[in-house]
Amino acid sequence: MNIQPIEKRRNSDGSQLEVHSVFNTIQGEGPFCGTPAVFIRLAGCNLQCPGCDTDYTTNRWNSTPFTLLQFVQEMRQAPSLVVITGGEPFRQNIHPLVELLLAEGYTVQIETNGTLPPPTIGFAEMCSLDTNERNRCFVVCSPKTGRVNPAIASLVCAYKYVMAHDSVLEEDGLPLRALGHTASPYVARPPKDFHRPVYLQPMDAYDPATNEANLKACIRSCMKHGYILQLQIHKIINME
């Protein structure tokens, strides 16, 4: 059970960010699945999902965007993928960090729960919906509540859902809940006119029988509704 506290949006100019960790890994999900990446995990989240198994609060430290860039450069010499995750990245003003990373030639992916708007009016200018592009910012949304903030929805290049076999709406094959968080009437769906990727991932219940049921439920939904089945490969290859 996740007991990490809910933290409100942090108003700042983005010159200082609360960071949990920076690490080199393989992106295990979403449109860049399988791509070597540096993850910047920011501290704190505006939600408290009971089923979340990610630590995003302990041992936090403050950093400037430039210091984070230096960490990235030490880990990935050639310009490549940087994933900003959390917690919830949009809880903080990440505009200066994203701008700096793009200026240095990196491609940036942001993983968000979709509840908070972008930190600045000009943030959208750095974003793209076409994941074939590089050296742009891409927003991937994994909804946890019943609504996605409209300002974020317009920037989302892909949606992803983690699904349990006993929490599926048969009408559209998507989850009723995400990580046990309350949602009314159920977790937010992509807009009706959304024609970009929607990924379904079986929830890891740490139980073989339940995991098999979760996988079969995802397969059924993908076959029926055309979603993309995706396994969390970072868990399969034992990377963070």
Protein language model features and the residues they cover:
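Short glycine/proline-enriched turns and hinge-like loops at secondary-structure junctions
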Residues: 31-34, 153
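Short secondary-structure boundary/capping segments within folded domains
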Residues: 28-32, 44, 220
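Conserved AdoMet/S-adenosylmethionine-binding subsite of the radical SAM
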Residues: 90-240
